[in-house]
Amino acid sequence: MVTVEDVRKAQRAEGPATVMAIGTATPPNCVDQSTYPDFYFRITNSEHKAELKEKFQRMCDKSMIKKRYMYLTEEILKENPSVCEYMAPSLDARQDMVVVEVPKLGKEAATKAIKEWGQPKSKITHLVFCTTSGVDMPGADYQLTKLLGLRPSVKRLMMYQQGCFAGGTVLRLAKDLAENNKGARVLVVCSEITAVTFRGPSDTHLDSLVGQALFGDGAAAIIVGADPVPEVEKPLFELVSAAQTILPDSDGAIDGHLREVGLTFHLLKDVPGLISKNIEKALTEAFQPLGISDWNSIFWIAHPGGPAILDQVELKLSLKPEKLRATRHVLSEYGNMSSACVLFILDEMRRKSAEEGLKTTGEGLEWGVLFGFGPGLTVETVVLHSLCT
């Protein structure tokens, strides 16, 4: 007689979840950060606000961002003047864009990841889709299933409105799905488009202006599975552990509200300070079981909320400047793409490691950390184990 224990054992994978492939995509429209303030104040009919424009120029100059990609072009914005005003009812116009474009951009990234993985898409058993750009029913997960031609029986999980920490969340969920379902191959997609948050400037809402200086569009996709098929699947990283926590005394530190005017964004406290103050505790809890306490001995993938967060984390932990190289590179080339950022950084790290002939995907090191920071203030901590390049 078969027992429940026997059934459970047969259902579970043997080894840890691994990242098997990564793909990324951006809209074609590239925006130069140095000239963006001119464009932004012109398109929003705000050129008379000279002092505010100077302030925004300084924000952009200090952002450490060279360029960003945006679905919103001058033509689209001219056709949708309500999106350009500071607080005009505009949710319908925004939704009409993102409901179509979020799955479309996700498809581009997913197609690249599936190609690298090298297996037929019929072998994808689960889909995790994450976006903070708009909501709809059936969701972006359903639309992507149709766009890619995945099996109708693919098990879908749709994550809306999570914000910037969710690149860590999707890895945590994909790990559990892959390890608890033998043979599972999880397609994870994060797709973010700033059409929901774009709006004109206001003297009284400077945190909105911070978002206008930092956010960019992008989608990233990964394939996660345990027990890779030898000679067929080439794992890049192992997902060793994953944790989520709400930081103490951080209520209202980062808020987003979906309203008639779109998604409004609020930074109410010292976010870089809160993160740097609590980051060592998260690291210690994650790495104590491995006997690791030297934060320069591991590789780093941190959500680049903005340069101030990275600077304070670096200072607090006495990190060598090269530790956040991949993170800063992605911030500089793409801006803050919310949940997709950490997956872009993962991609950048494994590519650069291979290019430089380093022995592992994690800059030649064995162990690493991936951090997501976002509304709550919520922190996701994922421990990674790199593999041979």
Curated annotation (Swiss-Prot):
Keywords: Acyltransferase, Transferase. Coiled coil: none annotated. InterPro entries: Chalcone/stilbene_synt_C (IPR012328), Chalcone/stilbene_synt_N (IPR001099), Chalcone/stilbene_synthase_AS (IPR018088), Polyketide_synthase_type-III (IPR011141), Thiolase-like (IPR016039). Its EC number is 2.3.1.74. It catalyses: (E)-4-coumaroyl-CoA + 3 malonyl-CoA + 3 H(+) = 2',4,4',6'-tetrahydroxychalcone + 3 CO2 + 4 CoA. Mainly expressed in flowers, to a lower extent in young leaves, and barely in mature leaves and twigs. SUPFAM superfamilies: Thiolase-like (SSF53901). The active site is at 164, 303, 336. It comes from the Eukaryota. Homodimer. This is Chalcone synthase. It comes from Rhododendron dauricum.
